[in-house]
A protein has these predicted regions:
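Cytoplasmic membrane-interface "Motif A"-like loop-to-helix N-cap segments
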Residues: 63-76, 277-289
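C-terminal ends and interior cores of transmembrane alpha-helices
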Residues: 77-91, 290-304
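Juxtamembrane intracellular "pre-TM" segments in multi-pass secondary transporters
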Residues: 1, 179-216, 241-246
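Helix-loop boundary and gating motifs at the non-cytosolic
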Residues: 1-48, 211-246, 253, 326
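Multi-pass alpha-helical transporter architecture, strongest
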Residues: 6, 85-89, 169-181, 385-419
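Cytoplasmic helix-loop-helix junction between adjacent transmembrane helices
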Residues: 100-138
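Hydrophobic core of transmembrane alpha-helices in multi-pass small-molecule transporters
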Residues: 12, 82, 92-112, 116, ...
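A membrane-interface helix-boundary motif in multi-pass transporters
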Residues: 152-168, 367-393
Length: 419
């Protein structure tokens, strides 16, 4: 079977698992179980908590003790078991712990999938810059497909969403053992010091200025991603409280409107190779930050009637905001680290974006919104909220090019292919 097709299948299932429940778990929580909103807030914190330590830890394990594709498969099989047990849970506290356990198994597979894909492409003499983005696009397609499968089968409030995700996780776990081997590379290194053995040498990247700065901005951009995930859908839902808007299609079906963001992801992924070759990694990252400014700024002045075009354009811009940093960031890590620590380094990248970034964004935005943008009647000043978020992204975009000193060079493609 063609290696590209095999990696496409891997990416499709990787994100199908997440898409099968991530956007519909709220409907299950409130409409099926009738549990409280305060308790539900803790559910999304499990992603940040698990992303802080698990990707880096499993990256170290993959670099030192076990083939990355085997570890990837084991984690998905364990994730399938936890997902299939969720329908048995009868109280929100236990539900939190089971979801946390599932996230502990799932979050590291995001970085491991990159490690496995890059190794397989290089082993087949493929160019990562050219060949990986069209493969990764199928992950987003998988996410969208899962959302539509669950919705069209009327399982948005049903336990079946977890069974669907579990079945695909089990299939991916088994399939992973057939992927090209990605063995630990420490065995090729003669210096097996205590630091190398535990994988702590990957953390030494923080001593290198360009990496310290890169990881800091990874955290800040991770916070921006959390802001849009947490408040985008809620923002549109709140228009139902305005009589003039409550019967509009965008208000009745906000998830359909927001799904434009995922479609945009698939299109911007295809543009990444061109932008990387034309502008280099540094400016592609900068374009991502400017896109976040537009994402939030357009929301600030939009509405579901005459301003619907702004909501749609904001969703389109999201593709650039999300893809241009996440994909170019993983390529930066890939090209600037030695083979022995790449798995650990990819884990650190995911830890900063989905771990500390998610927690930072969730906590600070909650405090700011409650303190400055929540009215006495508990309604929210959404324009103020989005302008605040846009200002945050703008400050990041202004500072970044002055402190991140990384120059694009013509040898980038060669370094990626032969590193």
């Amino acid at each position: 079977m063609n290696i590209k097709f095999r990696l496409i299948l891997m990416n499709f299932m990787q994100f199908f698992i997440w898409g099968a429940w991530l956007l519909t778990i709220g409907a299950y929580w409130f409409q099926n179980k009738g549990w409280s909103g305060a308790q539900f807030g803790a559910i999304f914190s499990t992603m940040g908590i698990s992303a802080i330590f698990m990707p880096a830890l499993t990256g170290i394990i993959a670099d030192r003790f076990i083939n990355a594709e085997k570890l990837y498969g084991i984690l998905h099989i364990l994730g399938a078991l936890t997902l299939s047990s969720l329908p048995l849970v009868k109280d929100p506290t236990t539900f939190f712990w089971v979801i946390l356990l599932n996230m502990i198994f799932y979050m590291p597979t995001l970085s491991l999938s990159i490690t496995v894909a890059y190794a397989a492409l290089k082993g087949s003499n493929k160019d990562v810059v050219i060949d990986y983005p069209p493969i990764r696009i199928w992950g987003t397609i998988g996410f969208i497909a899962a959302l539509w499968v669950v919705s069209l089968s009327h399982n948005e409030t049903s336990v079946n969403q977890f069974y669907i995700a579990s079945a695909v996780a089990l299939a991916l776990g088994i399939y992973s053992f057939t992927l090209p081997k990605c063995p630990p590379l420490l065995s090729k290194v003669s210096n097996k010091s205590f630091v190398n053995l535990l994988g702590l040498n990957a953390f030494a990247l923080f001593k290198i200025p360009k990496f310290a700065i890169f990881f800091a901005f990874s955290l800040l951009l991770g916070a921006a991603l959390q802001l849009t995930n947490a408040y985008g859908d809620t923002f549109i839902h709140d228009f139902k409280n305005v009589p003039a808007y409550q019967d509009l299609i965008a208000v009745k079906y906000p998830a359909i409107i927001m799904s434009i963001s995922q479609v945009s992801e698939t299109l911007f992924i295809l543009a990444i190779p061109f932008f990387l070759r034309k502008f280099g990694i540094k400016y592609v990252m900068l374009f991502s930050m400017l896109a976040w400014v537009l994402r939030f700024g357009l929301f600030a002045f939009s509405n579901p009637a005459g301003g619907l075009w702004m909501i749609i354009l904001s969703c389109i811009v999201y593709g650039m905001a999300f893809d241009f940093f996440n994909i170019s960031g993983s390529l930066f890590v890939e090209t600037q680290t030695t083979p022995e620590i790449r798995g650990s380094a990819q884990g650190l990248f995911m830890m900063m974006v989905n771990g500390f970034g998610a927690l930072f964004g969730s906590f600070t935005s909650g405090v700011i919104i409650d303190k400055f943008f929540t009215m006495a009647d508990h309604t929210k000043n959404w324009q103020g909220i989005w302008l605040c978020f846009a200002a945050y992204a703008l400050v990041i975009a202004i500072i970044f090019p002055f402190v991140f000193r990384y120059k694009h060079n013509a040898a980038l493609e060669h370094a990626i292919q032969h590193a």
